[in-house]
Amino acid sequence: MKNLCKISDDYLNSKLKYLKLLSKQYPSISKASTEIINLEAILNLPKGTEHFITDVHGEYEPFVHVLKNGSGVIKRKIEELFSNTIRDSEKKMLATLVYYPEQKLDLIIKQEENIDDFYRINIYRLIELCKYASSKYTRSKVRKLLPENFKYIIEELLHEHVKSEHKEEYYKSIVETIVDIGIAKEFIIAISTVIQKLVVDRLHVIGDIYDRGPRPDIIVDKLIEHHCVDIQWGNHDILWMGAASGEKTCIANALRISARYANLDIVEDIYGINLLPLATFAIEMYKDDPCKEFIPKVNDQSVTTTEKSLMAKMHKAISIIQFKLEGEVIRRRPEFEMEHRLLLNMINYDEGTINLKGKTYKLKDTYLPTIDKKDPYKLTMEERNVIDKLVSSFRGSEKLQKHVSFLFSKGSIYLKANSNLLIHGCVPLNEDGSFMSMNIMGKEYKGKALMDKMESLAREGFFFKDKAEEKLYGMDIMWYLWTGKCSSLFGKDDMTTFERYFIAEKETHKENKNPYFKLRENEMACKRLFEEFDLELDESHIINGHVPVESKNGESPIKANGKILVIDGGFSRAYQKTTGIAGYTLIYNSRTLQLVSHEPFNSAEEAIANESDILSTTVVVEHKAKRKMVRDTDEGIKIQEEIEDLKLLLMAYKKGLIKEM
């Protein structure tokens, strides 16, 4: 901060235009002075709690539960506050009440003989818990989180500190009135929601909201409602973002994955995308084809044989369209260096074989009626009609456009937050640890610059409406971010989708991870990454998701002596056999950095009825002897800049350069 005594009149005059604008907000010396005092006080509060979650993969129930319980933070605060004063069964009930207030109260009302007594006891407990959770925040910050209909009442109850007979009677009368006039249920729901918000100051979602899970839309809706959230895009997110932009290969990939996991409901029922043209085409083209390799992976017994058969045909139809469309992009963008993924022209259609890397393999499925062996990447007129209609549907889906707009507004490829670097996948590296480079529009990019450029192009692909060439390039980059070797979201050399469908030999299915994933075990390699992103070696961490941590095989989520933390591990049920757990989350408060591992979550219904919580184990990765204050955070830097501006405004008032209003 500049020494204000040494500020010259010339410097002050150079800032005058901005200071005059600031004076509209603080029109007097007293108002500017009061704001400086308030901001200085905020700087000396403990930093808020940050919550890190990654790789949700559409599994909305465990995600919503972890969001509600703050990865165990609420349960911990209940234990700290009521340790020996209430029974364990009451603590469990209170925690469930905070997580699911409306549903839990519906059950309790049916069971409880004296519901008014229950209301009184638990309103007092919830007020104490809310006080405890809000203790490190300013009144104004807490006020912003309060619901309008109960704002005054909750504020009065939270800030009851004067112990006098009259005051105690006053607060008791508030609680009695809440119960007597029949709004106790609504009040408990309101204050429980406030507690959920207070325990986590900021939520970081490090990618892959979308994938095979049933309801990514619920997850996005919850994030839209969240008071403070940021998102680092995952490869599955960018796929849907590209699809919403109208990028045909992204649309085909998104539909293929949805069909593969019998999850087309999200496409048709939730996002309102018309799949009839695809279904009609698939039935006509593959009428007598069992599409054995394309039967959806589904455990739901309610899916009929007829439905599976239709989905298999749609799955095959969109897969072939995808391979053709990808060929178009690869040939259009030689700088993507993906010519080796042009596989349709490597097929011997007469013999039903394919030649890969000098070796011939038998195809598992040779019924390919829409492929012209002389021009295998050419879409038939019917296929072109199907994809054109799908583009129109994806672009016209109001809900999808709203969700993807939110992902762009709150999201990025990476984020620097309070000395931590958040990236879903990796920073693309070569074997020797140097940054992998890519030519984009005639210029080489690598490291941070490459990630910045790709993000900028992706935004152009979505937002540009009238610049056709720029929009097309941006859309192609979104597909590349899904599948390209220099993509920080994908982090592999190849995506062997074709091989997995058509070739039995698993040697062809292999996808080699970027060297980053091996080198991130090395502290020296981390040092280079920290330098690239201007991070302090002693204070910083890189936080990744993307690759499941195989805990059951002894793999640790803590890499490079604690410099890198990997918090993917199994929100998706499909990965839980590999990981042995149901994922990691991370909690970063003013004193500690805590890694939390979770056991599988059954259902919200069971959690409400049986007061069962996700079993979680917490490991303290770091413990600071000195508490981290707001002053030490990114927000603190902004506040200090604001204070400096206000002090300049004070000087301008005192020198008469700006008149008080």
UniProtKB/Swiss-Prot annotation:
Record InterPro entries: FBPtase_class3, Metallo-depent_PP-like
Any one of the GO BP annotations: gluconeogenesis
Keywords: Carbohydrate metabolism, Hydrolase, Manganese
EC number, as in UniProt: 3.1.3.11
Pathway entry: Carbohydrate biosynthesis; gluconeogenesis
Pfam assignment, any one: FBPase_2
GO molecular function, one term: fructose 1,6-bisphosphate 1-phosphatase activity
Cofactor or coenzyme needed: Mn(2+)
Catalytic activity: beta-D-fructose 1,6-bisphosphate + H2O = beta-D-fructose 6-phosphate + phosphate
UniProt xrefs under Gene3D superfamilies: 3.60.21.10
Family in the record: Belongs to the FBPase class 3 family.
Designated name of the protein: Fructose-1,6-bisphosphatase class 3
Organism phylogeny: Bacteria, Bacillati, Bacillota, Clostridia, Peptostreptococcales
Gene from which this protein is expressed: fbp
